Amino acid sequence: VSTLSEARSEFWRSYTSKVGTFFIILLTIISIVVVLTMPLDFGTRYWSNPIYWVDNPKASPPAWINTFMQDKLVEHQIISSNAPAQVEDLGGSYMKQYILTYDFKYSQFPSFLTFRLTNLVFYDKPPIIRVYIVRPDNKLISILTYPVTVEGLNQTSPNILFKSEPKRFLLSGDPSLFRALSDFLYKEFNITYSPEKVSNIGVEKIIFGIPQQDGSFKPLNGKYQVYVLMYCDNRNDSIGGVAMVFGGKVYGLMGTDTLGRDLFQGLLFGFPVALLIGLATSILSTIIGAILGIVSGYVGGKTDLIIQRVADIVNNIPLLPLLIFFTFIFGGHLWVIVFILVVFGWPSLTIIVRSMVLSLKSSNFVEAAVAVGASSGRIMLRHIFPQVAPFILAQLIFYTPQAILSESALSFLGLGDPSIPTWGQILDYAFRNGAVYLGYWWWILPPGLLIIFSAITFVLLALGLEPVVNPRLRRRR
């Protein structure tokens, strides 16, 4: 192609080019949004921190599957409040009331209940926290009484508790709630159940259900009001946030793994990681391979011999065993993987570019440049490189999916960078936890499809560039 405009027109003529361009734009936009909106230390601070995901359901499918189900599964919900709805003066003390509303509309029960308390501030005596639930049938259940206890009260400044990590109460396993529900059943329904039997039945069925004659519980749909009452001696005492976790059986857009991690966030973070690995590896490998190939073909002599023998040796070394070996020795850090891929990724391009340069070396425009006294460096840069540049660009794009697939293979083998979530790591953890045998399709299909998507994107671009690089293909079309 003689001009850039002709090359662009030729590239844009094929449908593969258009689809590949659309895919790469989509991949780039998602990667930029992720980098701008998610912390760069997401892997170490959140993804590898099980405490951060403790309130999520474990191994839950995505919530959108309810669209295809007649009997809807309970969606996971966290309902919170940061400000009291009411402050009441009790004469010498105060009562601050927080109200949470939960709309229960399912034929099944929540899988667990958790109450969460954040950033509790008090000045004098520790407050008392009480939590009640008012059901749609106006029956009241006391689910938690928590007298705040702390050692070494601060007399000069306010005491601050649960600032960095919230205080959690797993109500589903609370013995005091078992006793409270035992009393509730006797008082409201004249049913005598021991706390042990309440534990076996499950607190969720009793709180959100109506007892039946056969001993089962029928879900009671409607709005549930959760009242959080803080009794304190100082009006300035406060709670930064209260939250009630209603454990569901479906979660978010992509579900969760066995640690409760939101797979959607992990998959999103994998976009810029895949793009970084692919582009960094392919760009560096292409630069090294192109420079050595041009120098080898034009300079010739011992320089050509040394470069080609080194390229032959490196090109015949099996890459995957070396990747496994070096990542096992030096650790599976991202830049170690990129470095190894670059070191062993340049020879094939060097060999091909050299053969192209050998034919260009005897061309008229090169001989004319030599005749007017142009230096070897200028000839290689100004006359030879532009002739092989389209091919080099096509190879750069074609090498990118190889790097992405290599990193995914290492991660799948458990040798990836543990501090960064990648699609291969998600697949590896899924297989190690039996996701295939347990039917956790949402844990396997999305990362696998995204790996294929990223690889196909660059393959389509490379196929679109073939008519630009190879005039014979252009004429056939």
PLM regions: where:
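Alpha-helical transmembrane segments of integral membrane proteins
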Residues: 256-477
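Gly/Trp-centered helix-boundary motif
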Residues: 1-278, 285, 430-448, 452-456, ...
